[in-house]
Amino acid sequence: MKLLKIAVVVLGIACAGTTNANGSSVSSDVTEVTLTKPRMRWLWGGFGFHNSEATMTPLMSDEFRDQRVLKTFREIAPTYSRVFAGFADWTREAMDSFADYYDATFRRAGTTLYLVPGRMPVITDDFDFEGYCENVATRLDYLVKVCMCVKIRYYALTNEMASGPTWGWFSTHRDVYEKLCRALYAAFRRHGLDIGLMTPDSATPKYIDDVVWATKNLNDITEVYCWHYYDRAAKPGEARVYNDVYGHLTNLVSLCLGREKRISLGEWGMTGRNVPFREGHMRDDGHGGWRWPMSAFAREVAICRAEMGLAALNAGALNAVSWTFVDYPDPFLREDGDTPEEKARYDVARFSGWGLDVRYNKNGLFRWDDENKDYSSYPDLYTMGYLVKLFRKGARVLEPVFDDPELRVGAVTNPDGSCSVAVINWGAAKTVRITSAHPFAKPLRVYEYDSAKPPMNAFNDLQPMKGVVVATNGVFATTLPSRAMAFFTTDYTDRTPPSVTGVKLGGDGALVWNTSADSDHVYYRVYRDGEQIASTVATRLDVKGAKGVYAVRSVDRWGNVSE
């Protein structure tokens, strides 16, 4: 398999040069892309995020939860997710809080979950291996059988082979790692849990040998192999962004297939510019959008994030997780207290990952900044949103063939015959003609991200469709801006959702309305005097009694808006 998985022909078709909508010149050539449909195509398990917020709801205001977190999750509806969860000392209160979040998000989207309990505790000489694993299994038993969190499908022993403060500790203590994994496997079987082990959950090319070792020593108890990759040096547009992910995963896919297994890209991300981990007295774990807001780098690295996902898709990975869905909150201290609020905060600190008091972990699609009440989106929302929404689990991959080194392409078909295509253009604005071996049953909706003018939205709504394009015999042409990404899809239903009823101002100064009975409803948009003032999953909005003409519209899972 070749890097960039392409072979294409760039046709020098004689046609007049054109100008794109943004005023940039468009190449007079037409770049040809062919989507092939091999007899045997690999099954895709879905893109998703590390949903760190799933254990952090006690820290959220109602406004942040309903208007940003739940609203954005339901709009994207990821079909795969990774969560720091499954702790051996997880409290009933914290598990119930997680189960409530599960009901509000994962259950609605049918999201498959991969759990990992952050970092394992330090392995001491008297560590109780069997007791630890039994405690994990008992808690998962409660979540699966009592709370009915049945989409918990995978579990990894620890994040990136870490033990306590030592990242990668198990890479040099593999005998201990194996002993614990086998004890976990036995505990899950005793409890009748259909939860497969993901091993080794290691990271970086330096530790690929952990995966090789696991295939030789843990294949009998491993459900899926797992590896992480971060790019901290490449620049947007460099071929290495795609090629490094594609190359490493192609080799790992082959290795794991030889053991009758598949591999997951358990985390991926890109920071770039060789940024040091430490800045001043704190650790910097932020992406470009947080470090350099709305800079050219931040606007373009949002494309890189999706580009790395396409590399995983085309390399044959089972699924892939982008770190993270929402920013972590600002650092805070871990300490118990007497009030319910203090105890909830203590549980969040214990069960949400390592180093919450020293890290600025800002890698989300949108901000979590309580101090400044800033929950706005990063450019990443408008590349990753549709990648995760449209490239969902249960799809099969179409192999793209082309020869333009400035393009990146990915495509899938779904069991209902619908198809989604993603195209990245790192070159000058150009016309691309796509020929698909899979027929397009209806016009394709088009969603575009132009890094020169990202489609930012004050309420974190995904960008509306730019329009539709009609294919003839599986062929359509489109013009792509420079350094941009576009999605084309027949995975939609064209409809008008039922209107929202019962809109009125309550006596407490809040606007209220009736719950939508539409099974495809996702969230509400609220308008005053024709201007949108909020997006929310709630049926109440505090407008402080402000006078005006109010309207509430329902948005369904395909982005259709009611009247």
Region spans (language model):
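Substrate-binding cleft and catalytic face of glycoside hydrolase catalytic domains
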Residues: 71-236
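Noncatalytic carbohydrate-binding groove/subsite architecture in carbohydrate-active enzymes
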Residues: 174-315
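Aromatic/acidic polysaccharide-binding cleft in carbohydrate-active enzymes
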Residues: 270-391, 395-408, 415
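Carbohydrate-binding surface patches
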Residues: 402-442, 446-451, 483-487, 518-519, ...
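Short beta-strand elements bearing conserved aromatic residues within extracellular beta-rich modules
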Residues: 444, 524-526
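C-terminal beta-strand-rich structural cap/linker in extracellular carbohydrate-active enzymes
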Residues: 464-495
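Pro/Thr/Ser/Gly-rich low-complexity, intrinsically disordered linker/stalk tracts
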Residues: 492-520, 557-563
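Beta-strand-rich modules
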Residues: 542-561
